[in-house]
C-alpha cells in the first residue's frame, strides 16, 4: 500500500538530507519548500526499517541492482579473435560490400578486367595491389593509401578491384582537305586561301576538257551564265566559300559542263547539251522528209508545216 506524508514530515526529512549537516552523501534528497506530499512505498519503508529516512548505502544498492538488470551481454572477445592454433578465421561476417555500378559511372571510370577474389595478408606489400586511375588525379599506387599493418599473418578473403581507365573525349584533329594524290593536305584553319584553291577542283560529273564552276561573285549575284574556266577569287573567306559551295552543289545538276549555262531543270539541261554534241534524235515522221531535230518541239513544229502545205493544196483543188 502507498501512504503519503504531510508537508511538515517532508520538510523535516529535508533536514536529514542536507549535505552540510549529514555525512551520508548518497542518500535520497527532497526539494526544499515542496508543496507536494512525498510519496513513499510501504515496501521501501519496511526494507529500511527507519521510517522515511533513506541513507546512501541503500540507495547505492538499488542503483547497482538497476545497473545489473540493464547490462548488455556482449560475446566474449575470444570468439572475435582468430584461433591461430587451428588456423581458423574469426567468427565474423567476411562479406565485403562494394558500391554498385552507378557509383562507378559517377566516378567516370570503366572496368577493364572482371573483379576477382583472392586471399591476401594484412601486411602485404604494394606490389600485390593494382594502380588506380582517376580523372582528376595522377596514377596513385595502392601502397600510398592508408591501410592497416599487422605483424600476424591474418588471411581474409578480400575483393581486389581491377585497373580502371578514365573516359576521356576523343582528341579533335584539325580538318584537312586533299584534292588529288599528287597534292599535299593543307589545314584549313592555318591556310584558308590555299585550301580553297585545292578544293576548287573539277567535279566528277563533268566530262574532262570542259569548263569549271562559275566564280563566287557571279554565283552570289545570281547570274545564269558564267565564263568557262573561271577560278574562285583568292581573297574570299572560308564562310563565303562554304556558302557558295552549298549553292553550287544544288545548281551543279542544272549547269551545262560545256558553256556553264545554268538551266531551270535537268530536262532542259539535257536538251541544251545536245546542241554541243550535235545529236538530232528527233526525226521528222513525214513521208519523204529526212530532217531531224535535237528538240522534240522543233520537230513537231516542222511536222505542222507539212500539214499546212497539204491542206493548202487540197483547198485549191
From Swiss-Prot:
Gene3D superfamilies: Classic Zinc Finger. GO terms for cellular component: nucleus. It is found in: Nucleus. It comes from the Eukaryota. SUPFAM superfamilies: beta-beta-alpha zinc fingers. Coiled coil: none annotated. One of its GO terms (molecular function) is sequence-specific DNA binding. Keywords: Metal-binding, Nucleus, Repeat, Transcription, Transcription regulation, Zinc, Zinc-finger. It holds the Pfam family zf-C2H2. Disruption phenotype: Leads to altered expression of 79 genes, including genes related to transcription, genes involving cell rescue and defense, and genes involved in cell cycle and DNA processing. The keyword Zinc applies. Residues 1-22 are annotated as: Disordered. A zinc finger (C2H2-type) spans 254-276, 282-306. InterPro entries: Znf_C2H2_sf, Znf_C2H2_type. SMART domains: ZnF_C2H2 (SM00355). Residues 1-15 have a biased composition (Low complexity). Probable transcription factor involved in the regulation of the transcription of genes involved in cell rescue and defense, as well as cell cycle and DNA processing. PANTHER family: KRUEPPEL-LIKE TRANSCRIPTION FACTOR, KRUPPEL-LIKE FACTOR 15. This is Zinc finger protein CRM3. The lineage of its organism: Eukaryota, Fungi, Dikarya, Ascomycota, Saccharomycotina. The gene is CMR3.
